[in-house]
From Swiss-Prot:
GO molecular function terms noted in the UniProt entry: ATP binding; glutamate 5-kinase activity; RNA binding
Protein family (similarity comment): Belongs to the glutamate 5-kinase family.
Pathway(s) this gene product operates in, as recorded in its UniProt entry: Amino-acid biosynthesis; L-proline biosynthesis; L-glutamate 5-semialdehyde from L-glutamate: step 1/2
Function: Catalyzes the transfer of a phosphate group to glutamate to form L-glutamate 5-phosphate.
Protein's recorded name: Glutamate 5-kinase
Amino acid sequence: MTDRNEFLNDINKIVIKIGTSSLTKQNCDSTKENCSIDPTFIENIAAQVSELRKLGKEVIVVSSGAIGVGLYELGIAPKPREIPIRQAAAAVGQSILMQYWSEAFSKHGIKVAQILLTYEFYSDRVSYLNLRNSISTLLEYGVVPIINENDCTCTNEIEAIFGDNDKLSAMVASKIDADLLIILSDIDGLFDKNPKIHEDARLISLVEKITPEIESYGGDPTSFKGVGGMRTKIKAAKICSMAGCYVLIANSEIEDVLLKVLSGKEIGTLFLAERHIQKNRARWIILSRASGTIRVDAGAKAAVLGKNSLLSAGVVDVEGNFDRGDVVRLECEGRVFAKGITDYTSEELMKIKGAHTDEIEGILGYNNYSNVIKKENIGIMEN
């Protein structure tokens, strides 16, 4: 058994992600699907956060639950398919959610601040950079930021983007250089097989590196109230790993779970971080929404992983429509291994794919860039 204190002794900045199922578990109707906020749970979390702050820890909370609470309050049947209804529910539920958080923390003399984000926010470089400053300022003033996705105004299908805020919490943790992301849900951690089906399923206490085998353990979502299954939590761990941030997945039903985790108790699954931390710009590129895909050959992949630029000779195919300056995925043999900011449009790349640099001008009539993607504009997603 691994000594958790070996990894968690120097933890100072913590992001706590709380899933919908945890927030509403004890306050459901007879169907077990239509649920409202469990105030006792929120009060317990606030009390634990207060204790962590007394120990000098900085804490940010990422809270799901707005849509579910809104549906309950409006008397709407669970899981409506219509986006406008879900957005309306989110608007109602978010205000109620914040009221509970504010009241719970006020009992400990702590103020809270609401921050609502969308994925598009991360694709804008200026907004992305400003997030760090905003959160840092709130922490300096002793405020606990409460973050959620802006479900009411997001232009994409709700919950298809962040995965019940698993990805959102990881992106926040990555951006603010958090030391630890704690994901609380209704599951005990990562198992080598589905524990609801297999009695011999084994809880994996420590993940040193996220391998394809580890990813295969993700399976399908396990919680019927949230949308964030284990697969999205593993993806969240991958995002945090490249930023040097640990991830701990634990069951929210454990009494004083946050305090026990930080005291080194063997709870849930701990994902370690990469030793090589991606630079801030590379992290932004990786976290940005891709406008398309550039498929490359094995030689080009090796060159990119070796911290070299992508040349047109290594381009095999192009998918999607994108312009110069857009973020695109780099794919080889069906696997995305990097993202980058392209210097050529998809239309141009279709014409020059496979061509050597000195042939570009003859094909296009001009040669504005010798590289398809400069090395400083690439974020590596696998080593």
